[in-house]
Amino acid sequence: TPNEQGVFTEDNTARFSSAVWYENIRSKTIILAGVGGIGSWTALLLGKLQPLSMFIYDNDAVEQVNMAGQLNSTNNIGKSKVDALSNTIKKYAAYNSVFAVNGRYDMSCEASDIMICGFDNMRARAMFFDKWKHHVALKPDDERSHCLFIDGRLAAEELQVFCITGDNEFAIRNYESNYL
């Protein structure tokens, strides 16, 4: 539909279609591993941005205990988290380029420029970060700034979010040394 200026926009992304970063995100593949308390909500919001594609990884099934902080409904209990979340994203974000991988993300999995970590254990975080770091190392120097690693950590009363670009060697070393 045309907006006030007569420019056609997609209704479901019109709110942020004029943002300077918007066209960039639409050309990106995003990998999000761990779709619990942080990952499930993040995936929904990313779906609303309509990236080129989004791969979500998790090997857990939805349980009653997940109702407290995760994006789930009681209708999803017993289903795989990624299948339930994928269906939710398709329904509430009108986004169909989300790919559910019902399994653990491991070193044999593909990496992408944008990787978001929603794991709840340090070993998985370290492996996921190593995979991203290796991917970035293969990029030409001028493309590394377009690579992004995000690690969200959630405790009962504390939230930490680490955002690292591929060209920030200090942040990469600091994260490895002090936060993994």
Q: Residues of each region from the PLM?
A:
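A structured beta-alpha segment of the ubiquitous adenosine-cofactor-binding alpha/beta core
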Residues: 80-112, 119-123
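N-terminal charged helix/coil linker that caps or initiates catalytic domains
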Residues: 1-31
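Short His-Asn-centered micro-motif
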Residues: 33-34, 57, 101-103, 117-120, ...
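Conserved beta-strand segments of alpha/beta enzyme cores
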Residues: 53, 97-99, 148
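Glycine-rich adenosine-cofactor-binding loop
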Residues: 26-51, 55-63
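E1/E1-like adenylate-forming module used to activate ubiquitin-like modifiers
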Residues: 111-180
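Flexible, charged surface loops at secondary-structure boundaries
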Residues: 24-27, 48, 108-111, 142-144
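Glycine-rich phosphate-binding loop and adjoining beta1-alpha1-beta2 segment
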Residues: 53-94
